[in-house]
Amino acid sequence: MPKQDSLWLKSLRWIQKHLVHTIVVPQDPFADLNLDASRPLAYVMKTESLSDIAALSEITTKLGLPSPYEPLVVNGVVAPRVVCLEGRKPLFGERASNEPFLECFMRLLAVHKEKPELDIQLVPVSLYWGRTPGKEDDTMKAAVLERENPTWLRKCLMILFLGRHNFVQFSNAVSLRYMADEHGTDMGIAHKLARVARVHFRRQRKVMTGPVLPNRQAMFHSLLKSESLRKAIQEEAASKKISETQARETAIEYLDEIAANYSDSLVRIAERFLTWLWNKLYSGINIKGAEQIRQLHHDGHEIVYVPCHRSHMDYLLLSYILYYQGMVPPHIAAGINLNFWPAGPLFRRGGAFFIRRSFNGNKLYTAVFREYLDQLFAKGYSVEYFSEGGRSRTGRLLAPKTGMIAMTINSVLRGIERPVTLVPVYLGYDHVMEVATYHKELSGKKKQKESVWQVFGAIRKLGNFGQGYVNFGEPITLQNFLNETAPNWRTEVADDPEQKPTWLTPAVNVLANRVMTRINDAAAASSITLTSLVLLASEQNALERCLLERQLDLYLTLLKRVPYTSFTSVAEGDGKHLVQQGLELNKFSIHADPLGEIVSIDANQAISMTYYRNNIIHLFIIPSLIASCLTNNKQISRAHILGIVSDFYPLLKAELFMGIKDLPSYVNQVLDLLIEQGLVQESDTLSVVTEHTSQMLLLAGSVSETLQRYAIIFNLLAHRPKMERSELESESHLLAQRLGALHGITAPEFYDKKLYNTLSVKLKELGYFSEKEDKSDVERIRDQANSLLRASVRQTIVASVTAEHIV
């Protein structure tokens, strides 16, 4: 390798500085890969390349990593900082030998044998000039821009045409100390290291570029030849009394309507546009958990992303983040309502495939869609779909639609060999631009049909949207899930492939709820969501600034010291910082008087802010319920609090998709923290410390509307033990409207009929609609709910339930 200060390398670096734009994956290798700055470090690259090392040099300088041009000097042994598996590929003739690099491995291993305290980190580094996976019939482009083993001439063309799309990916470091101790230090180990590294680089390339893209028409013909589609076409022809040719043409029309037409060129253009858009809209995108997903890709998993659905921005945000995290944007299941010009064709070329809201018993369409989905899985394309079926209008997760999850499980049952893994994804925003529209729809206004004019209208409103949040939850590998749910599933399916297993529908429902729970497990507690939670729990949606900051400090401490899950993310900074962020985004108002500053939510903004509160209310609902028990009882035991929480938790779990694994432990940890913070005191019983009553009342306020709903339900059940589920749902909704009108409750979810349906289903599951005469459980929970309400609210509920027009 020429010297760092040689004229040739200086010239090369100057040229690349102007032609090359490099994206680093991950953005912070020290933090994401746990690199140790105190230990020696060497880089491992697949192929010796001056241009690759020049690009790496630029990045290492910015990141504070050792330069690849600086030799590695350890205990008097001098070795190159970069170890390559292959020599350069010349324009003609044979590739240069890699023996010098293997000798470097040997020297480094030998030093470890002599120095037991030494531990060099070997960091694999992959460089990609463009990320085009290529097409099945794209031979000319592959010949000109062959990426894996280019000659210097091809590399020059790649830098010229693809230099603005250069990616440098760092991987987890390998400990040479571990290798030397476990496997020895001879030449055989050096060769083994090289072989393992080659496999790593091959897998890494597939993660970065994805599988080869199919020719769309060729794929259609291949799908139409499948046994299941041939059978579906024959049945369509017989049932509709048409020819098989006509039925086949219908199937082709369905395929054309459904199938994506992924274009790498469009993705590159979209990447530039979206970079501009995110920089204009957001002050930052916070990402948590991407490394575990990269590893799943690397290990050969078929990945299915299942995000929550807040906004049309979701389609763009997740694909963009995955692209910049070194993964291929997924094929996205989009509603057919988004297939309008010009967005539809663009979405399709960006990887969207379109699905009808309902298949309406259309067996041919179902067969076509199922076969297409199977093909995506078989070819190794990652897939994304929204299990809620539509965007949440309240900020809470919607009950899942199970159709796509059922189809995914059926694909596994039909014999996908690779592990298929669902990845729950929490998407959050400091500002959702559709929130105002959502509340109009909830108040009865008809939903507008998507069109190009809506797009232009949205663009006009672009402004400072704060920050976005992408948190990857705990993955669910379907083969493992099936082993847990139905241990003999492989045998059952093999014995009778056409027979639907009796356990399948319950398993799909369990899986769908588990996905939603793990989405909520990965929630992002941000400045906007936390501040909304506090202010909406106050009497007039207003607090003195110092009190608001103090309450936020308490919530931050609670989330950090008693974490909801390890996948949850918490805003950086203290309460003062969070309030300032909210004010800068104009989400809250501030008024000064001689006694200080008051932060409030304007009356016309209060309903909108419930959306952001609802994103994270599940994180605080148990602490809030605990606070409600404490503030409504002068003295109360831990056992009594745990009993109340345990009674309400099944309903909270169903309503808010909660997944606390050890409820008693969690309750005790929250109580211990409240005692440690000086808010609660404990002798034989627990009581609120008088000077901190206001803080405890604020914490208790977040659960008040939920308790009011439960009080309505259990007062009705206790008063009319034999009422039907449908009656309970309709009368609960009617009573909620009355309560809201009398007591000023404006939260949209309070009047959501679907929520009362969810609760009634859970109540039936728990046995509250049984024919048993003993209703002590219902009466106990009714009394508990009533005891935690304000007297005026309790009186309204009790009086309304016993009134003639209700019964």
Curated annotation (Swiss-Prot):
The record gives the membrane topology as: Peripheral membrane protein
Among SMART domains, the record links this protein to: PlsC
> In the UniProt record, does the keyword Membrane occur?
yes
Q: In which pathway does it act?
A: Phospholipid metabolism; CDP-diacylglycerol biosynthesis; CDP-diacylglycerol from sn-glycerol 3-phosphate: step 1/3
Q: Name one GO biological process term.
A: fatty acid metabolic process
Keywords, comma-separated and alphabetical: Acyltransferase, Cell inner membrane, Cell membrane, Lipid biosynthesis, Lipid metabolism, Membrane, Phospholipid biosynthesis, Phospholipid metabolism, Transferase
Keyword Lipid metabolism included in the entry's annotation: yes
Give the enzyme's main class according to its UniProt record, as a single word.
transferase
What are the recorded GO MF terms, alphabetically? glycerol-3-phosphate O-acyltransferase activity
List, alphabetically, the GO terms of the cellular component aspect: plasma membrane
Q: Which InterPro entries does its entry note?
A: GPAT/DHAPAT, GPAT/DHAPAT_C, GPAT/DHAPAT_LPLAT, GPAT_PlsB, Plipid/glycerol_acylTrfase
Which reactions is this enzyme annotated as catalysing?
sn-glycerol 3-phosphate + an acyl-CoA = a 1-acyl-sn-glycero-3-phosphate + CoA
Q: Where in the cell is it found?
A: Cell inner membrane
For this chain the motif HXXXXD motif maps to 308-313
Known EC number = 2.3.1.15
NCBIfam families attached to this UniProt entry: plsB, PRK04974.1
Q: Which family does it belong to?
A: Belongs to the GPAT/DAPAT family.
By what name is this protein known? Glycerol-3-phosphate acyltransferase
